Amino acid sequence: YAIWDDHDYGHNNSDGSFKFKNTSLNVFQQFWPNPTNDSLNYYTFKKSDVQFFMLDDRYNNEQEKTVLGNRQLDWLKKELAASNANFKFICIGMQAINPMSTKECFYKTNTEYKTLLEYIQQQQINGIIFLSGDRHHAELLKVQEKGMYPLYDFTTSPLTMYPIKIGKKNKEFKNPYRIDHTYYPNYNFRKISVTGDFKDRKCLLELKNKQGKVIWRYEIKKMDLIAKP
C-alpha cells in the first residue's frame, strides 16, 4: 500500500495546478497495486480491528485553501463513520495537525480541518490517529481540541532523502504540541503494533533509526481515544 506526496507527484510543494498530474496519477497507479476509488488516489483498507485511510494531498490541493477537495473529504467522513475499527489511522503525505507549522500542513487549511473535526465530534468517531511525513525529521505531536479526545500526528521521514534540522530561531524549534523527546532529525522509520484484549487494545508507536534501533516508544490506549457524548 502506498500514498504519494509532492516529490512522487511532481515538483517540490506541487499542488492541483501541476499540468502533468494526470500522467503522474496514471504512472503511480500502474506502479502501486493499491485499491482504487473512482480512479483517484485515495482508498481505505482494514487489518483486524485496525483501519487505514490513505489520502491524496496533492491532486486537489489549492495551496492551503483546500488539500483534499470536497469529494475526497466527503468520502473520508463517510468511511470514518462506517468504520468499527478500534484504531483508525488517517495517512497523509504532509503533516496533519501542527498548529506551529511553517510548512505545508492540513491543519492550515482551516475550513477542511474544522469540517472534519466537527464531523468527528458530531458522529462520536473513536480511535483516530494521524500518520504523516514530508518534514525530513520525525516527531509526535499532540493537539487537544475543545470537546475532543487528544489528536496525535506521528510524523516520520526521511528514509532515503536527507534529514533537515529545525533552526533554533524557527517557532517550531520549541513546539509546545510536540511530545517531549520525540523530535529526531535523522534517517528514520516507524513501527506500529496493536496488542491486548479486544476491549482493552493498546497501540504502540515506535520510531527507529536506519539500522532498526528503537529511538523512542509511545503507547496510546483505546480508551484514550473515546469521543465524548
Segments (PLM) and residue ranges:
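Metal-dependent phosphoester/phosphodiester hydrolase catalytic core
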Residues: 1-229
